[in-house]
Each structure stands twice: as C-alpha cells, then as structure tokens.
UniProtKB/Swiss-Prot annotation:
The UniProt record lists the keyword Endoplasmic reticulum: no
The protein's name in its UniProt record: Protein T1
Lineage: Viruses, Varidnaviria, Bamfordvirae, Nucleocytoviricota, Pokkesviricetes
Coiled-coil residue windows: none
Record SUPFAM superfamilies: Soluble secreted chemokine inhibitor, VCCI
Family annotation (InterPro entries): Chemkine-bd_vir, Orthopox_35kDa, Pox_vCCI-like_sf
Extent of the signal sequence: 1-17
Family the entry assigns: Belongs to the poxviruses A41 family.
Length: 258
C-alpha cells in the first residue's frame, strides 16, 4: 500500500508539473527532438553498452572581420572533447551550429550530428546479441531544470533548419560500461502526419551492419495537436536503402549513458 501511495503521489506531481509549465502564453513553444536507432549487426558481439560518450559542439559566428571566428575549449578528460563556438542567431539557447554525440558500445561506434536542432539531454543504449538500440532525446520541459521556450516564428525556423546525420562504424572497444540506471522517459512530441526531411548524411559500415532503422520526431512537447512538428525515417536492409516510412521503433529498457 505504501508503494502504491508513493507511485500515485509521483504521478500526481508529474501531472501538475506538466500542466503548470505547459499552460503559459499561447505563443510559448517548447520544442524537442527524439531519435531512435535500431541496428542489426551481421554477427553477435559485445553486449556492453555506454563504453564511451563524447560530445563536440561546433557553431561558427561572424566576428569583426570578414571570416568566421572560432572559440575552442578542451576539457582535461581525454575521453571527452568539447568544442564551443558561438552563434548570434535569434534562437538563443539552442545550438544553431552542429553538435556531435559519439556513443561507443555493443560493438559499434555511432556518431550523431545535430545541426540547428533542439538540445539533446538524454543518451541511452541497449545491446543484446546482434541487436543494438540507441536513443537520443530532449528533456520534457517539466523535467528540464532550465527549459528553453521560443515563439511560433522561431519554432518554424527551427523546423526548417534542424538536420541530423549518422555515422555508424564497427568497434572493438573493450572499456567497461558507464551507465546511470535506466534511461528516463522520452518526451512526448506532437505526432506529425507527414514526413519531412530531417535525416541528412548517413554513413554505415557494412562490414558489421546488416540492417538499420532510424526514426526522428521533431516538434512541440506540450501540445496534443500542432502543426509545428516533423518526422523522418530511414531503413537500410542488407546494405540497400529502402523507401519505407517507419513511424516508430519499439525499444526495450535502455540504459542511460549520461
């Protein structure tokens, strides 16, 4: 009974928090992104996930001169390299340049690139046998400690600019996993009725990858219906790109890599 009460209290708190932050001015938009990848490898391999996670930020801006200026900072930890460059776009708070996340685990090294997209806060992975799942997503605004809101005009620009890239390579990494429990729930993003162009460059190492499924959902996180949403998908089977429209990928319980 005590456990049931705790669960109910958590649910009630989450409900009120959701309604509280989402019930704001009509032109306040909370945009998020959710990327799910399922890789079927050619052979079974390591089931160790989250062996390494590296994040690189790149966002050029116009300086005083004719050329773009660049500011770079390297952290002390050799396993993590961060590059900071600053952009003067009106979409303050979002990374307008490119952000790259490299996840090593399950016998793969996968780099995701996000250009002009909402910030990814959660990275998680699952591996068993030949199957590897990876998910990258924004935090729901009621769970985010510093949720970023924009207006409709800015949201439309975000939908136009956001592009993702994927580079999947084989990996023989032997480092033990670093996980932080089960991954948190992905944000609920308003379902888009039509497919858009979000997925850009995709590189796949066919020496170890047999099949690949990718879905990307981009849009509002506070509204049941909205025209401010896009989705895209990609499917590779036996090394061939297929024109299938996959709406969603069901994932098992993933482990948090950050």
């Amino acid at each position: 009974m005590r456990r049931l009460c705790i669960i109910l209290l958590v649910y009630v708190y989450a409900t009120f928090a959701t309604k509280g932050i989402c019930k704001q001015d009509e032109d306040v938009r909370y945009m998020g992104i959710d990327v799910v990848v399922k890789v079927t490898k050619k052979t079974s391999g390591s089931d160790t996930v989250c062996q390494a996670l590296r994040t690189t930020f790149e966002a050029a801006h116009k300086g005083d001169g004719a050329n773009d200026s660049l500011s770079t900072e390297y952290v002390d930890d050799y396993s993590e390299e961060e590059e900071y460059e600053y952009d003067e776009s009106f979409l303050e708070g979002f990374v307008i340049g490119s952000t790259y996340y490299t996840i090593v685990g399950g016998g793969l090294s996968v780099t995701f690139g996000f250009t002009g997209c909402p910030t990814v806060k959660s990275v998680s992975e699952y591996a068993k046998g030949r199957i590897v799942f990876i998910r990258l997503s924004s935090d729901a605004p009621w769970r985010d400690t510093n949720p970023m809101s924009i207006n409709r005009t800015e949201a439309l620009a975000l939908l136009e600019k956001c592009e993702t890239s994927i580079d999947i390579k084989c990996s023989n990494e032997t480092v033990s996993e670093t996980t932080y429990g089960l991954a948190s729930l992905a944000p609920h993003i308003t379902q888009a009725t039509e497919r858009g162009n979000i997925i850009g460059s995709t590189l796949v190492d066919t020496d170890c990858v047999e099949n690949l499924d990718v879905t990307v959902h981009l849009g509002e996180m506070c509204r049941k219906t909205s025209d401010l949403s896009k989705r895209d998908s990609l499917k590779v089977k036996n090394g061939e790109l297929l024109d299938d429209d996959t709406f969603s990928i069901h994932t098992p319980k993933l482990k948090a890599c950050n």
